[in-house]
Each structure stands twice: as C-alpha cells, then as structure tokens.
Amino acid sequence: MSTNNSVLVLKVGGALLQCEMGMARLMDTAAAMLANGQQVLMVHGGGCLVDEQLAANGMETVKLEGLRVTPPEQMPIIAGALAGTSNKILQGAATKAGIVSVGMSLADGNTVSAKIKDERLGLVGEVTPKDGTYLKFILEQGWMPICSSIAMMDDGQMLNVNADQAATALAKLVGGKLVLLSDVSGVLDGKGQLIHSLNGKQIADLVKQGVIEKGMKVKVEAALEVAQWMGQAVQVASWRDASQLIALAKGEAVGTQIQP
C-alpha cells in the first residue's frame, strides 16, 4: 500500500489531558509540523476523564484484557467524556497553540464502519476504514482533525472504541504514518528499560512472558497491525519527553519501533 508521508497520525492517551504542560508542548510541536506543510491528524482517548465521570455517577469501571467494558447505561457518560469534554480540552490546547482544528468523532463523515467487537464487552466497537473524503478535505485545508473514539453503527447505536484501535483504522484510511503517544517512553522490558525495536515474534514472546500486558498489549497489537498493513514501522513513544517530540517533528525515529 502506498503511504502518504505528509499525514502523521498522532494518537494521544487520556493521561495527557491531566497535564497542561504536556498538552501545550505537544500542540506546539504539532503547530510547527503544520507550519512546515506536514498534515497532522490527532486521535485521542480519555480514560481518566471517563473514570471520573463514571465514579461521579456512582458507576464502576470494569476492564477485560485491557479493554473497557461498556454497559448500555454507561454509554451516554462515556460519549460525553470522550466526544465532549476530552475532545474540547484538546481543541482548546490546539487553539491556544495557533492551530485551526476540527473536533470530530469516528461517527462523522462516514469515515469508518463500526460493529460490536465482543458481546462480553458490551457496547465496545470494532471499526474498519470506510470513506476518507471528509478527513482528507480537512487535512488539505491545513487544519488538524482531533478525533474522539466514539463510533456509530448503521442503526445509530453509539459504540466506545479503544483509541489505539481507532487510530489504527484512521491511519489505514489516510495511508498515514502512525505514532502512538502515551505517558511512557515506549515499550519497556522486564527491567523497565526501553526496547528500541520489536517485531511480531518478539511481541508474541513478551506477551507470553507477561512483560507486555493489558493496555500496552492492546497498543502494541494495534501498532503491529498498521505496521504490517503499511509495510513500515509504527512508533510507540511519549508525549512527556520533549526531546522525543523534537525528534518526531524532524521525522526521526523515537520510542519503540514496531516493525512489520
């Protein structure tokens, strides 16, 4: 598949929303990229905000194999926290950095097809790329889409999608280069040291050993899927590390490279 190197897909985790300095630094990096003609698409989660909102409503958070279980009664709260609050916090940070952004969700513009991922998870969605017209139009204007991971089935039912998996679908759709940013510098080994490069076999071994588990397992498997689809490495890196962001802006490799 041909890769459009002018689209960089940045996935950011919910922890970023609780770090004003981290958000400002990341948005300044994105603004510099956009000024250089780099198209940037941001995809976000918001797990910490979801947890807060659920707790405030007397509801508990349950996870299964690193994925949030989403009972129907929690869906409106999760959608509000992700497509509403989280999205607008990031849009505010983008505006402050001088970026023209478009707040959106996976449900917009016929962008993806969505279905229930696993009945045990409730209203958790699995998405596949559908139509890139809407996204490509936004990117061509030099604007930055900021996309939440709320999707919609053909019958109008909202679904909660894991943000790493959402970013995977959008990277495939626009043929972009994917970077999964979280609050850790990349994939760490059993001793807490950064692993600079991983392939499918090494990932399977580390999962078996319990070194890669839960949310990182979901993240790394999403990265591997895109790496194999695109035939190019996907980066797992940190928004906390200013030097990684500067290297990223220059197009250099950062964090852990997930190899196809």
UniProtKB/Swiss-Prot annotation:
- Binding-site residues for substrate, renumbered to this chain: G46, G47, R68, N160
Q: Which gene encodes it?
A: argB
- An MF annotation (GO) of this entry: acetylglutamate kinase activity
UniProt xrefs under SUPFAM superfamilies:
Carbamate kinase-like
Q: Which UniProt keywords apply?
A: Amino-acid biosynthesis, Arginine biosynthesis, ATP-binding, Cytoplasm, Kinase, Nucleotide-binding, Transferase
Source organism of the structure? Shewanella sp. (strain W3-18-1)
Among the GO biological process terms of this entry, one is: L-arginine biosynthetic process
Q: Give a Pfam family name.
A: AA_kinase
Per its record, how is this protein called by name?
Acetylglutamate kinase
Which EC number(s) are documented for this chain?
2.7.2.8
